[in-house]
Amino acid sequence: MHFAGIVAIALATGATAYDLPENLKQIYEKHKSGKCSKELQGGYDNGHSHDGKSFSYCGDIPNAIYLHSSKNGGQYADMDIDCDGANRHAGKCSNDHSGQGETRWKDEVQKLGIDDLDANIHPYVVFGNENDDGDDPEFDPRKHGMEPLSVMAVVCNKKLFYGIWGDTNGHTATGEASLSMAELCFPEEDPSGDSGHEPNDVLYIGFTGKEAVPGKSADWKADSTESFEESIKELGDKLVAGLKA
């Protein structure tokens, strides 16, 4: 990508990149190294062959769930691209050959006035794993207090972004988010349906409790990622402020 293109993307997304508050900086550094002491479910990979099935859902942060691996001295997750939902072949999702026609919480989304989440607009995180064939470890975040379509915090590129829990994974893959979330996090990498962010340095934080659900206060009909993220920022800030390092 030409430098001018990178600058244009950065300017377009910069308004929604939030600085890390001090407690989140401490959380990121503290929980990255070492092992997860409160493993909720392990046996997952990052969708690639390296690092094996070393990833787990961890409950070491009170009132939150996050992904972690003890490999390489401790690491978080990568960001593969999900294009499921509405307009799944639109824009830079056009080269995604693994997308599905709907997201996990489509029925709930329709109650909020839209047909389904749009990976090109809604910055959602793929979190939790369905037991597709009976042999894979299942993890349902709802059993640990998370609610569908609740706000999630994503620490990437040394910045904070807000998204929602919008989909689940099959089998053992973890570390996935919608195209629009990847564009917020890594505009300089020009993500697409077939190209994500490989380093395991992304911290996905899901919040437990019904208070993490924005409901109708979120701008589900937003025509841009920035507008949607701004509509959940106040709630996201409140949830992040409550995290203890």
Curated annotation (Swiss-Prot):
Keyword Zinc found: no
Location(s) in or outside the cell: Secreted
Alphabetical list of InterPro entries matching this protein: Chitosanase_fungal
Pfam families: Glyco_hydro_75 (PF07335)
Enzyme class: hydrolase
GO biological process, one term: polysaccharide catabolic process
The enzyme's E.C. designation: 3.2.1.132
Molecular function GO labels: chitosanase activity
Keywords of this entry: Carbohydrate metabolism, Glycosidase, Hydrolase, Polysaccharide degradation, Secreted, Signal
Known catalytic reactions: Endohydrolysis of beta-(1->4)-linkages between D-glucosamine residues in a partly acetylated chitosan
Cellular component GO terms, alphabetical: extracellular region
Entry keyword annotation includes Mitochondrion: no
Signal peptide residue numbers: 1-17
Family: Belongs to the glycosyl hydrolase 75 family.
The protein's role, per its UniProt record: Chitosanase catalyzing the endo-type cleavage of chitosan, the deacylated form of chitin. Chitosanase may be crucial in the degradation of the deacetylated portion of chitin in the fungal cell wall. Chitoolisaccharides produced by the hydrolysis of partially N-acetylated chitosan are known to have many biological activities, including antibacterial activity, immune-enhancing effects, and elicitor activity.
Name recorded for this polypeptide: Endo-chitosanase
Gene responsible for this protein: csn
